[in-house]
Amino acid sequence: MESRISGHTKLFCLIGSPVGHSGSPAMYNYSFQRTGLDAAYLAFNIPLEQTEAGVQALKTLGVGGFNITMPCKTAVAAYLDELSPAARLIGACNTVTVSEDGRLTGHNTDGVGFVRNLHEHGIEVKGQRLVVLGAGGAATAICVQAALDGAAEIAIFNRDDEFYANGQHTVEKLAQAVPGCKASITPLEDSAALAEAVKNCDILVNATKVGMKPLDRDTLIHTSIFRAD
């Protein structure tokens, strides 16, 4: 990479803590090299309490844009010039673009990526009924983007734990910002309500840890609910 760095090379980066494990620098720098872009991507370890100082430093350096990971995804919003509609509703950013005049705009691409992947597989969310399992950050992003893209109904199911209040907050925000989408939240422990919702939905989303090790053999839904059509 050093052989292509010049005085004109544009810097992009990731901030958060920890970032040593991130594959983003390798991925972006490989892409820059393959496409011939005069750019470089680095990762900076920025703890939560240094979020503001980190953002100001990046503005001073004139970076072309940056990504944000935990624990700065929520805090960074306060130090940006504007937020995309999705980022504003989600309350967190993972990407910041920089305009020619230096203005910073925060985006959340988690939900966009989910909806775009569905589209690429011939599935549209507009007018559809979604059941979303989970109420964490990924679930929130998916719900918000689906609502903004015209989903008719979103039923969130989450265990009655510390994330349940987050799900309630998401429902309240969607009711105000996207009144055309009917959003609700129900305890995951209500198996009868879950079975009924899944039976009537068009798209079922698992945004929980179930399915990943060590929960890779667990399931939140009895397989008898599904039908092969």
Language-model region placement:
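Short, conserved loop/helix-junction motifs that constitute active-site signature segments
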Residues: 5-6, 125-126, 148, 220-229
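Receiver (REC) domain switch-region micro-motif
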Residues: 66, 130, 204-205
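NAD(P)-binding Rossmann-fold cofactor-contacting core
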Residues: 149-179
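Phosphate/diphosphate ligand-binding glycine-rich loop within oxidoreductases
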Residues: 4-121
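Rossmann-like adenosine-cofactor binding region
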Residues: 180-229
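Glycine-rich adenosine-cofactor-binding loop
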Residues: 16, 108-111, 127-151, 158, ...
